[in-house]
Regions:
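Active-site/acyl-donor-binding loops of N-acyltransferases
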Residues: 141-160, 266, 291-339
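A conserved beta-strand-loop-helix scaffold within acyl/acetyltransferase catalytic domains
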Residues: 28-54, 60, 69-79, 202-264, ...
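Hydrophobic residues on conserved beta-strands that form the core of alpha/beta folds
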Residues: 6, 82-84, 179, 267
Length: 339
């Protein structure tokens, strides 16, 4: 058996890849699967001209359904020492050595393309946090834990009384800030600030044991990101905090939801620059994006968010909002031996 790359433009091959991916997700936790729809994964894999693209890999015999599949987030413009990957074995074929065999070839794929380190992301379901097989499998294959995030879910719709209470408590702490909102496209006035916030996020956000990525962002890359989200069929709901004195954006928060499958809205990036923390900007922005979500009228049932266990301030905000633990996301890292 060999690993081979899938062309997402070939419907039959992509469907076979996605079938294994989806079965693995549902076997882990049917109620809390990651929620990526096939057209969303495909959009990320087709965008070959962008600064980043997802490579889809399958493992098995050519002409037969794959026994396992993988994703590799490939960056072109950023001098990143590692690539983030995922590996999913078909649930009916687990414990036969396919995961180990595929992992070896996945490591080779990353190393052969100039990266000295690999990161494998694993999501644990609500009923297996701390007990899932990856906790043994990864160390046995030379991996150490780079970071662990907790997933929390917030029931929707959000109680109006709680929203008003939190707003009244938090707003007085942010007198020198204005909360701005928009959907889909960043206003031109704020495009450079928005790019800067995303560029510095890897160094500003807390990670346990991962070398921060250095990312190059400008207005054009922000626009490309927004176009990709639109091609996925997702609403992009954004709040940002403007520091009145400096007239610059110092924080932002993104909430997304699929228009075709709106059961779960997902909190994507949220960042408050270190110099502006302590003013409850994270909570105020989350309330603002939830107001935008309410205006979409989509039949959402919950909002899901992931926070590094090191990010205690944002965890505290989510718990004050009423979010409850629903799973975990682990990033396993390994330094690859040179050939």
């Amino acid at each position: 058996m060999q690993q081979y790359r899938i062309d997402p433009r070939i419907d039959e091959d992509f469907a076979a890849w996605f079938a294994v991916y989806q079965r693995s997700e549902l076997a882990r936790d049917e109620a809390n699967a990651s929620g990526w729809r096939p057209e969303e994964i495909r959009a990320r894999a087709i965008d070959d001209g962008g600064p980043d693209v997802t490579h889809l890999l399958a493992f098995g015999d050519h002409g037969a359904p794959p026994v396992s599949v993988a994703k590799v987030e490939v960056t072109r413009d950023d001098p990143t020492p590692w690539w983030r990957t995922e590996l999913h074995v078909d649930p009916v074929l687990r414990r036969r050595g396919y995961g180990s065999a595929h992992l070896t070839q996945l490591e080779n794929y990353v190393r052969d393309r100039g990266r000295r380190e690999i990161v494998v992301a694993v999501i644990e379901g609500a009923n297996e946090v701390g007990l899932a097989p990856n906790r043994l499998f990864a160390p046995q294959h030379g991996y150490t834990l780079g970071d662990e995030s907790a997933r929390r879910d917030l029931a929707w719709p959000f109680p109006t009384a709680l929203r008003d209470e939190l707003l009244a408590r938090w707003r007085p702490l942010a007198q020198d800030y204005e909360i701005l909102t928009w959907t889909s496209t960043t206003p031109g006035r704020w495009l450079a600030d928005r790019a800067h916030l995303t560029a510095v996020m890897p160094s500003e956000a807390p990670y346990a044991d991962l070398e921060p990525l250095s990312e190059e962002w400008d207005g054009a890359r922000v626009r490309r990101f927004e176009e990709r989200v639109a091609s996925m069929g997702r609403e992009l709901l954004v709040a940002a905090a403007r520091h009145v004195t400096s007239d610059s954006l110092v924080a932002f928060s993104e909430l997304t939801v699929s228009r075709d499958s709106p059961d779960t809205a997902y909190q994507w990036d949220t960042l408050v620059l270190r110099a502006h923390r302590g003013h409850r900007l994270g909570g105020l922005m989350k309330l603002a994006t939830m107001d935008l979500l309410a205006h979409t009228g989509l039949p959402v049932r919950r909002i899901s968010t992931f926070n590094s266990l090191l990010n205690t301030p944002m965890i505290r905000v989510n718990e004050e909002l009423g979010a409850r633990l629903a799973g975990a996301n682990l990033l396993w890292r390994k330094t690859l031996a040179s050939t």
